[in-house]
Amino acid sequence: MNGIINLKKEAGMTSHDAVFKLRKILGTKKIGHGGTLDPDVVGVLPIAVGKATRMVEFMQDEGKIYEGEIILGYSTTTEDASGEVVAETPVLSSLDEKLVDEAIASLTGPITQIPPMYSAVKVNGRKLYEYARAGQEVERPERQVIIYQFERTSPISYDGQLARFTFRVKCSKGTYIRTLSVDLGEKLGYAAHMSHLTRTSAAGLQLEDALALEEIAEKVEAGQLDFLHPLEIGTGDLVKVFLTPEEATEVRFGRFIELDQTDKELAAFEDDKLLAILEKRGNLYKPRKVFS
């Protein structure tokens, strides 16, 4: 069994939980996921099965799209709704929506983030959330991410001394939307957190086409495997090249080939089938992963 599954992950489930359950449903151990989702986040979790597990790193590289809500007025230990309140800054008057949108725009493009303490990023061999649960604060490494698009998608509404609005973000891998929400609050002068989040797109897969675990289990029981997408969709943003029969033969034997390309990595096709991932070495391309 080989292919890519567009899984709709439910709230309360870790990405590891999803993989574990799918191994039981599909009866195979060779399964991986293409980008971790926090337990409280719902939405698209790309799953690689069989040969497709060799595509995971490329599936993770493609941009992701999220929709969620930001609340101004208080911040939490986890930067989302699951944590304890750590700071409060009441919103006592209406916000200027133009100024809010300008602050949002200032957080697009390449930005620097500091991962939240409640995250799986490792420092000195331990995950940050392990330090956090032990009540320890440690220095966290900065990381560079790219925010391709960040926009407010609703009017600002008010609930007592809180302000809230929904948003949409397209970003690179490694981006913490929780942290982006907190950083926006800081720019506006308020403590803030992310109240909920949905991933609507990842690895070229869309939420409207995603299937829940129960739906996949029903299809397997009925002998239907149409939920398995071909490996080709896992190439993500890699530039695609179509090889001649002679070039394809060389690639199958693991030999270098010459191509008029400049990209570091290429997805090489023979007809409409993915043959290999090629890696640039000097003026030539070397097969990095061969699939057939």
Swiss-Prot record:
Species whose genome carries this gene: Streptococcus pneumoniae (strain ATCC BAA-255 / R6)
Family: Belongs to the pseudouridine synthase TruB family. Type 1 subfamily.
Catalytic activity: uridine(55) in tRNA = pseudouridine(55) in tRNA
UniProt-listed CDD domains: PseudoU_synth_EcTruB (cd02573)
Annotated keywords: Isomerase, tRNA processing
GO biological-process terms attached to the record: mRNA pseudouridine synthesis; tRNA modification; tRNA pseudouridine synthesis
Biological role stated in the UniProt entry: Responsible for synthesis of pseudouridine from uracil-55 in the psi GC loop of transfer RNAs.
Catalytic site: 38 (nucleophile)
Protein name, per record: tRNA pseudouridine synthase B
Enzyme Commission code(s) on record: 5.4.99.25
Gene Ontology molecular function, alphabetical: pseudouridine synthase activity; RNA binding; tRNA pseudouridine(55) synthase activity
Gene3D superfamilies linked to this entry: Pseudouridine synthase (3.30.2350.10)
Pfam families on file: TruB_C_2 (PF16198), TruB_N (PF01509)
PANTHER family, sorted: PSEUDOURIDYLATE SYNTHASE TRUB1, TRNA-PSEUDOURIDINE SYNTHASE
